[in-house]
Amino acid sequence: ACIWASDALYYNSGAVTHSSAYNYRANKMAAVIAEKIGEDPTPYREEAGKILRALNARLWLSDRGHWAEYQDYMGHRRLHESAGVWTIYHALDSEVADPFQAYQATRYVDTEIPHIPVRANGLEEKDYATIATTNWLPYSWSVNNVAFAEVMHTALAYFQAGRPEAGYK
C-alpha cells in the first residue's frame, strides 16, 4: 500500500515515512480483522511491529523531533530531513507516534513549515494562519503550496496530538 502525495514526488525505492505509516496501520487493522473472522492475527501483528520498529530506528530524527520524509535507497542512503506536512499527519493518523513524538512532530510544523497569516475585516486579531505543505526550495507546484485538504488534515493531526488550540489556529 502507498499513497499519492503529489504528482511531483518520486522516491527511489527508499524507506518513506508516510507509506510506512500506512502499511503499519494496514497490518494492525488486518490483525484485528483476522481475529474477528477466526484467523491467526500473528503474522499481521508481527509485520506491524517490524514496520513500527523500522520507522523509529531509520526515520525518526530524535534530535529534530520528527520523522524524515524518506531515506534514499541508493548512493549514500541519505535522509531527507525536511518532511512535508503529509508525513506528519499520516504518521499521526496511522498511530505510529507515542504522545511525545506526536507533540514534537506538531512542533516541527509550528517551527519549520511556513505559516501564512489569515486576516480579514471582522475577524478577531489572533495568530490565525494557513500553512504551506513543505518548506522545500526551489518552489515547485504541488509540493510547496497551500492545499486546503492538507491544511485540514494537519489540523486534525494537532487534535490527535492533544494540541487542539494549535490545531484550531
Label every PLM stretch briefly.
Residues 137-167:
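C-terminal substrate/ligand-recognition segments
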Residues 121-147:
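Generic long, charged, amphipathic alpha-helical segments
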Residues 84-88, 132-134, 150:
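Short acidic (Asp/Glu) and glycine-rich catalytic loops that position anionic groups and cofactors
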Residues 1-4, 169:
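Short intrinsically disordered, low-complexity coil segments enriched in acidic
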Residues 7-9, 75-76, 134-140:
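Short beta-alpha connecting loops at secondary-structure transitions
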Residues 2-3, 12-18, 22-111, 115-123:
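Catalytic cores of carbohydrate-active enzymes
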Residues 104-106, 164-169:
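Composition- and surface-driven signal marking solvent-exposed, interaction-prone regions
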